[in-house]
Amino acid sequence: QGAVSEEMVNIWKKMEVIQENDTTEARYDGHSIEIPVSQIRLLGQHNYFDIGIAWAVCRLLNIRDEVFLEGLKTYEPLPHRLQFLGEKNGIKYYDDSISTICETTIQALNTLKDVDAVLIGGMDRGIDYSELIRFLSGHPVPYIILMEATGKRIFEEIRQDYPDFQKMERLILTDHLEDAVKEAQKLTRPGHSCLMSPAAASYGIFKNFEERGEVFARLVLK
């Protein structure tokens, strides 16, 4: 058991995930495998790292790369985690309702390259949004649709600290998710994506993040 634990630590420390041009490759212990990003449902650099770890463990268990890749291509990730919901009227919709902190929203926007509108906001727990605001001020996403209590606070902080950003008309302040979806549907161009990644808790508005994601899915696909 100790030897296995030590090997797992080594895998974690030495795993590399390299993105070059249109390829993503996991490398460990002199071996490598190309991750077929376009053929899998797991999105994001953090998931690609986890895929690399799983692949290295499979090598330890003498599972062939072809078998690993076959399983990877059919793996269905858990819902509400940067989940592709489908396409309607040419707009692709992604549900990242599990996002309750700044970092996850930043990861989502770094992963999806064609987002026209991102929906942010929820219950206000008093967390610091300065990192997310700095990121958004330099990110090319055309429309940032803010909702609920944290959306209002983010809007006010941007207005005070980034007045030029606020004047760019990229910010849309709404009350609730339903209003935010209506704005997103008007603003998102066909062929582009609409992402809900709230960076906030759902409590007091929804039962949990799962319900928030389910409501979002119903609103965008109805």
Predicted regions and their residues:
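ATP-dependent carboxylate-amine ligase
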Residues: 56-64, 70-80, 84-222
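Acidic, Mg2+-coordinating active-site environments of NTP-dependent enzymes
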Residues: 1-93, 217
